[in-house]
């Protein structure tokens, strides 16, 4: 196991160099975790955030393809999307157009009590407490499989984890169509 912690000054070019070294030493592609995407600096300064996120996203995608390694990025969200009654979607991620295009997989993690439809809350006041124990993982995009899947996992934050057994969400969530054609 090789863990390389970088600072906020580590550019994509430096990340690529370290990844090539790790791959050479280990003989297998490394797993790359970027926390978080909008903080990755570029060699050149300037440009708005969308342009910077686009360059970083494209660079990381090229790196993943060249080194044949998975890259997992955590992304910041727009402040407006964090308000009550709003369900986060890919479009709410900062620099979302590049993320929506380049990413093979986009997952959104939400607390269930924040995104379950009101109908499940008003008639059963105890349901709020039950829903607080769960998180919903929404598969917003999956280039190589099913997309628009909602799974729920039980929180086990005492142990810093989620329970490994996920299940499909059965309740209606906010911002879902009531009728489908």
Predicted regions mapped to residue ranges:
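Helical hairpin unit composed of two closely spaced alpha helices linked by a short loop
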Residues: 30-70
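C-terminal regions of RecA-like/P-loop NTPase motor modules
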Residues: 12-32, 59, 65-67, 80-181
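Flexible beta-alpha connector loops of hexameric P-loop NTPases
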Residues: 2-9, 41-54, 81-91
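Conserved H-loop
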Residues: 74-76
């Amino acid at each position: 196991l090789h863990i390389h912690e970088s600072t906020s000054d580590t550019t994509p070019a430096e990340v690529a160099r370290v990844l090539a070294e790790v791959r050479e030493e280990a003989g297998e592609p490394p797993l790359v975790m970027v926390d978080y995407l909008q903080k990755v600096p570029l060699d050149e300064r300037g440009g708005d955030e969308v342009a910077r996120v686009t360059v970083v996203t494209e660079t990381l995608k090229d790196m993943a393809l060249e080194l044949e390694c998975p890259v997992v990025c955590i992304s910041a969200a727009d402040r407006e999307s964090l308000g009550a009654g709003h369900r986060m979607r890919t479009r709410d991620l900062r620099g979302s157009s590049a993320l929506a295009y380049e990413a093979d997989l986009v997952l959104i993690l939400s607390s269930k009590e924040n995104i379950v439809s009101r109908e499940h809350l008003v008639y059963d006041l105890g349901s709020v407490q039950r829903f607080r124990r769960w998180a919903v993982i929404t598969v917003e995009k999956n280039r190589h499989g099913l997309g628009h899947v909602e799974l729920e996992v039980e929180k086990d934050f005492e142990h810093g984890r989620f329970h490994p057994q996920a299940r499909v969400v059965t309740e209606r969530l906010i911002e879902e169509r009531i009728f489908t054609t």
